[in-house]
Amino acid sequence: MKGAILLAAGSGTRYHARKQDLIFHDKPLWRYAYETAFSVVGEGNIVAVGKDIPGGETRTESVKIGLAALSEKVDRVIIVEAARPMVTREQIEELLKDPHPSSTFVRPLVNTPIYRDGTYVNRNEMYDLLTPQAFDRKMLQEAYQSGRFDNMTDETRVMFEYYDIRPHFIETESNLFKVTYPGDLDILESIYRTLEEKQ
């Protein structure tokens, strides 16, 4: 059975507000990703951490809470972020159908990354990791229950460090933009209009 966890408990430090609760086209931002995921996994197979149940102090805690709240029948879980509201049904279906135990959407880097010490990195050898991401639910839960991972920002890293499993990278479109700063709503509006025109 397929299940979904929506992460909607963030404090919005960089946005200076709880961005998941912002009203965008007459609807709270978090509802977009929630409704899209719901349309795929169905009633009873999705938990909105921060809405249906309280979230944790960190992303890691919120993911653990979400995993524990899902039905035991869920064997593959997709983790969706409220701050990426324009995820499509097709993208969620693609991840859930992928048999790999750790799957993630990626985009090629468009800017050249640099370490704080001034060391440059070849962007052609790197990806920008995005969400949603999908996992073997039992494996991810076991990794977190090991107690080795307290403050992770990405579950593919948990799977890699615990099982030595490299994620399956799936290149995707730019619609998985993450709302982070106040000015990002203008970019989101552009993506929203583009998706509306495609329908």
Where are the language model's segments positioned?
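Glycine-rich beta-strand-to-loop/alpha-helix junction loops that act as flexible
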Residues: 8-11, 56, 182
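Conserved beta-loop-beta/alpha segment of the NTase-like Rossmann-fold superfamily
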Residues: 53-123, 130-131
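Conserved alpha/beta core of the MobA/IspD/sugar-nucleotide pyrophosphorylase nucleotidyltransferase superfamily
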Residues: 128-199
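Residue-level signal for inorganic ion chemistry
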Residues: 6, 30, 66, 81, ...
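N-terminal glycine-rich phosphate-binding loop and ensuing alpha1 helix
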Residues: 1-51
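Glycine/serine-rich anion-binding loops at beta->alpha junctions
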Residues: 11-14, 82-86, 133-134, 180
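Short beta-strand-to-turn element immediately C-terminal to the catalytic PLP-Schiff-base lysine
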Residues: 24, 114-116, 178-180
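Conserved hydrophobic helix-helix packing surfaces used for dimerization/oligomerization
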Residues: 2-4, 77, 167
